[in-house]
């Protein structure tokens, strides 16, 4: 085990112990599980321990921790896995057991609604292992790990085995498995080596009586877990070792915990899963999951209303060829394209799901599915309302969201070249449009204006390329809402009539959902009316104020966020959403806010890309489960050039994973959104994650938040006195981290002599962090001589290999000192222009500054005009040559804006611009607040 350094014990089980360890070869933290020393001489248990590792290694699923390595040489028997930050389900349940009063936070975390998605993920993992022929045989809260980023993983595969394997009989023979009579069943909470496999408390009755394990024994354990989630208690209460006769009845979850508001059907699901007779249980985990679906996240139950055949004219009011460019010019690639056009005779309500499949060839030509309002469609205005256009080119599928004939959103993803058909699902409900292709989310759009009855419209060239179309309606939507009348007025833009009816409903149903929903829609009505007819949008805020403290309180902040969004007050919009999420994290309306966050993310990617980073951070922190693997890949690609421009990403070579603490820190750095830094600091400190702590202090310093920096520094000093940091490949330890932080504090206080003493005592990588932070401060404060000496000391003590990392700062000093010769030599030798410079790189900007120093203003303008990305940071820096308005900087994210101001100031100094010109940029840089909110 020389490769691994054990940091601390995480947990202990029946056979093994799990440690947090440092992998020296890969410079990463891992979880290392080794067989207990008191059991290491038992050949049967060694065999079972290795079988556990091999089974886990063969299973690939998000709910199963992958195995990195397995070692069985000599006395050492262990295997390693990724370390997942989090806690066990048992830990969460134990925190509320036998407590009469719970804190609000704990009550929300352990609510039925909060537990159901967790249970579904557990079931999904068990369904997967059953499909691979594996039985876990020891499912219990102890073996369920809840990660900080929404992960739900099953651990401890010591009892796992393949169904019908020979080992089942061998275990009985070798372990002396004896058949227990009904009256002799005892219960404990731990796997008993040498007797029975599994934890008796969670074993099905037939297993305790000696029957072989099966899928239904795992289902029984799942049922017990669900029972505990619903009731926060175990179904039977017996002292350890006490017999439990089967004649004792088990109370249903509703009877056990009547205060928990458990739906009767959910209670029945739990009781069916723990039925004594295996025949009465669910036949499979898939069946169990299917029964749960209507309860998950308030998901609507759908019923098939009709199936429309594209070949049967009776289903369609209009069924004729059209010239695509006549109605949808934005979609037509050729003015002479003719398509089959079909408009349904039936009318669908506002909650509808449309399902069909289309061939690859038809998508290459383009397929449209639209929802025109019946009133407009009957007048031949087929382009009105919402619609989707599906097209593909070069193995890329694109989905465009069309509103009133205008494309408002477009998303594209790669497809498998051999794929011949695509399954499409479009759902319109609760003011939300979601579009899935082959179960992958393409479009999420929210419109708070209600829609009236609509028809289904299909546009396709070849009718053979589309299947029959299934129309499903929400069961809840089949009931006519009292809000339907004012919704109809609002859809017709009859704002005064709509407002009058919304007020009536609000006053008629005090304390009920209809009341607060009517008040929210009243606010949307007034906001829309002001936006269309002119006026102060902020007047609508008072309408949403009336929701304060009501049963629909989160909608107050959602409504205000809508006002601020339309008013262009982005910071206030974010503040409103955060208040709702902080005050009401488990409120039934919070999923609505999470959906809104997702919509704003996708919408900002399409319209305001700088805002997207903030929404990305919020979703990563609050609702990471909303982001799928395909979206993760897309977002990582979107962030790639910023990653290349971030110092701590270049120094720390650990890959930037989307759902990680490092990504949260990365987004905090770029957005200036430091609200989550205290939690990130505490997490890194508890994990003794040296590199993460360095990065956090760098980000805090870059933000300029001295108060947070001081608090973190005090906490770190106390912590380092109490613990020992693990060695890394660079022998970096806690003492060096303290020196580094003291050096940064000295730089902040302009105590340069002390700063030099502290920073000179730390490794070069840490010196580079300090150098980068000092460079911004030194040039803005015009203390370049001190910085130059600091830089020279670091350069002299660094290795030849490390010299390349400080070249940018040396060039900056040369340019500031107007040393054209040295600046040119450094630039041409290390960043030759003929090799092609990346336009968002520091070197590209420094070449522009060099040209400015030569006095050739036209050459400088030509240099920056070469930028392909006209709204990229480098292109915007060039605008300062002729424009001092700073308005063009508003589209930049916080750190981009700050860096652009600095580099524009530096460029103007090189251009020998009048002081009053470059002082505008200097003061703008200084005046930037030290955080997102200011």
UniProtKB/Swiss-Prot annotation:
Residues at which ATP binds: 10-18, 33
Protein modification: Autophosphorylated on serine and threonine residues.
PROSITE patterns cross-referenced by the UniProt entry: PROTEIN_KINASE_ATP, PROTEIN_KINASE_DOM, PROTEIN_KINASE_ST
Active site: 138
Swiss-Prot/TrEMBL catalytic activity: L-seryl-[protein] + ATP = O-phospho-L-seryl-[protein] + ADP + H(+); L-threonyl-[protein] + ATP = O-phospho-L-threonyl-[protein] + ADP + H(+)
Keywords: ATP-binding, Kinase, Nucleotide-binding, Phosphoprotein, Serine/threonine-protein kinase, Transferase
The EC number(s) this enzyme carries: 2.7.11.1
Protein kinase domain residues: 4-296
InterPro entries: Kinase-like_dom_sf (IPR011009), Prot_kinase_dom (IPR000719), Protein_kinase_ATP_BS (IPR017441), Ser/Thr_kinase_AS (IPR008271), Ser/Thr_kinase_PknD (IPR023507), TPR-like_helical_dom_sf (IPR011990)
CDD domains per the UniProt record, alphabetical: STKc_PknB_like
GO molecular-function term, one example from the UniProt record: ATP binding
Xref: HAMAP family: PknD_kinase
Family: Belongs to the protein kinase superfamily. Ser/Thr protein kinase family.
Record's function text: Together with the serine/threonine kinase Pkn1, may play a role in the specific interactions with host proteins during intracellular growth.
NCBIfam families: PRK13184.1
Name of the protein in question: Serine/threonine-protein kinase PknD
Originating species: Chlamydia muridarum (strain MoPn / Nigg)
């Amino acid at each position: 085990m020389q490769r691994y350094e054990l940091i601390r014990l995480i947990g202990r089980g029946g056979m093994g112990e799990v440690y947090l360890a440092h992998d020296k070869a890969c410079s990463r933290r891992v979880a290392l599980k080794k067989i207990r020393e008191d059991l290491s001489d038992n050949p049967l248990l060694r065999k079972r321990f290795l079988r556990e590792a091999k089974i886990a290694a063969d299973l690939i699923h998000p709910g199963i921790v992958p195995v990195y390595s397995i070692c069985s040489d000599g006395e050492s028997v262990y295997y390693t896995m990724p370390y997942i930050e989090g806690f066990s389900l048992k830990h969460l349940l134990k925190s509320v057991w036998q407590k009469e009063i719970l804190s609000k936070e704990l009550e929300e975390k352990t609510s039925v609604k909060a537990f159901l998605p967790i249970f579904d993920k557990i079931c999904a993992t068990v369904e997967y292992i059953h499909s691979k022929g594996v039985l876990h045989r020891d499912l219990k809260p102890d073996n369920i790990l809840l990660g900080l980023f929404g992960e739900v993983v099953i651990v401890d595969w010591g009892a796992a085995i393949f169904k019908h394997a020979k080992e089942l009989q061998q275990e009985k023979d070798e372990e002396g498995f004896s058949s227990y009579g009904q009256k002799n069943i005892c219960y404990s909470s731990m796997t008993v080596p040498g007797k029975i496999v599994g934890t008796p408390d969670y074993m099905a009755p037939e297993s305790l009586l000696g029957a072989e394990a099966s899928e239904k024994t795992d289902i029984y354990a799942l049922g017990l877990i669900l029972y505990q989630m619903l009731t926060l208690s175990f179904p039977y209460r017996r002292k350890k070792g006490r017999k439990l006769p089967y004649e004792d009845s088990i109370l249903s979850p509703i009877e056990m915990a009547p205060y928990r508001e458990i739906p009767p059907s959910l209670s029945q699901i739990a009781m069916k899963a723990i039925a004594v007779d295996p025949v009465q249980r669910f036949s499979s985990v898939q069946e169990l999951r299917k029964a749960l679906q209507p309860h998950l996240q308030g998901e609507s139950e759908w019923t098939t209303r009709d199936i429309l055949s594209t070949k049967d004219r009776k289903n369609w009011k209009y069924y004729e060829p059209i010239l695509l460019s006549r109605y949808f010019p934005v979609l037509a690639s050729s003015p002479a394209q003719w398509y089959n056009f079909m408009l349904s005779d039936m009318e669908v309500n506002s909650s509808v799901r449309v399902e069909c499949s289309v061939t690859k060839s038809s998508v290459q030509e383009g397929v449209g599915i639209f929802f025109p309002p019946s009133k407009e469609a009957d007048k031949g205005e087929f382009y009105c309302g919402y619609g989707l256009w599906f097209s593909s080119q070069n193995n890329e599928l694109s989905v465009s969201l069309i509103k009133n004939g205008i494309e408002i959103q477009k998303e594209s993803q790669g497809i498998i070249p051999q794929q011949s058909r695509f399954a499409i699902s479009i759902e319109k409900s609760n003011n939300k449009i979601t579009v899935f292709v082959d179960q992958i989310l393409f479009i999420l759009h929210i419109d708070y204006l209600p829609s009236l009855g609509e028809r289904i419209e299909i546009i396709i060239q070849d009718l053979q390329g589309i299947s029959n179309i299934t129309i499903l309606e929400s069961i809840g939507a089949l009931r006519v809402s009292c809000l339907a009348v004012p919704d109809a007025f609002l859809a017709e833009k009859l704002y005064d009539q709509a407002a009058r009816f919304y007020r009536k409903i609000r006053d008629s149903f005090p304390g009920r959902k209809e009341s607060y929903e009517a008040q929210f829609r009243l606010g949307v009505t007034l906001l829309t009316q002001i936006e269309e007819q002119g006026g102060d949008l902020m007047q609508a805020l008072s309408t949403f104020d009336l929701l304060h403290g009501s049963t629909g309180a989160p909608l107050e902040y959602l409504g205000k966020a809508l006002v601020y969004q339309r008013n262009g007050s982005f910071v206030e919009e974010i503040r409103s959403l955060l208040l709702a999420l902080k005050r009401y994290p488990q409120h039934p309306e919070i999923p609505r806010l999470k959906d809104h966050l997702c919509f704003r993310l996708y919408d900002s990617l399409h319209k305001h890309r700088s805002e997207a980073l903030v929404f990305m951070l919020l979703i990563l922190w609050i609702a990471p489960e909303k982001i799928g693997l395909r979206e993760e890949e897309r977002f990582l690609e979107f962030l790639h050039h910023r990653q290349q421009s971030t110092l701590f990403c270049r120094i720390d070579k650990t890959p930037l994973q989307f759902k990680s603490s490092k990504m949260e820190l990365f987004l905090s750095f770029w957005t200036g959104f430091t609200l989550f830094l205290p939690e990130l600091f505490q997490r890194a400190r508890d994990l003794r994650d040296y590199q993460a702590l360095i990065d956090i202090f760098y980000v805090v310093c870059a933000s300029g938040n001295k108060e947070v920096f001081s608090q973190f520094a005090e906490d770190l000093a106390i912590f380092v006195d109490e613990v020992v940091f693990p060695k890394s490949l660079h022998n970096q330890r806690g003492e060096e981290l303290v020196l580094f932080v003291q050096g940064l504090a000295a730089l902040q206080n302009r105590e340069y002599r002390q700063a030099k003493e502290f920073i000179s005592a730390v490794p070069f990588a840490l010196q580079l962090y300090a150098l980068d932070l000092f460079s911004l401060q030194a040039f803005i404060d015009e203390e370049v001589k001190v910085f130059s000496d600091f830089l020279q000391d670091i350069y002299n003590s660094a290795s030849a290999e490390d010299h390349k990392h400080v070249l940018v700062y040396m060039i900056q000093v040369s340019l500031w000192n107007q040393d054209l010769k040295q600046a040119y030599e450094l630039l041409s030798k290390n960043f030759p222009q003929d090799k092609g410079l990346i336009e968002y790189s520091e070197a590209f900007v420094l070449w522009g500054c060099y040209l400015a120093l030569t006095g050739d203003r036209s050459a400088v303008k030509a240099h920056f005009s070469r930028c392909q990305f006209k709204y990229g940071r480098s292109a915007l820096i060039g605008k300062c040559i002729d424009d001092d308005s700073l308005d063009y900087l508003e589209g930049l994210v916080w750190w981009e804006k700050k860096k652009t101001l600095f580099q524009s100031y530096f460029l103007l100094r090189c251009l020998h611009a009048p002081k009053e010109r470059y002082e505008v940029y200097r003061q703008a840089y200084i005046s930037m607040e030290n955080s997102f909110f200011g």
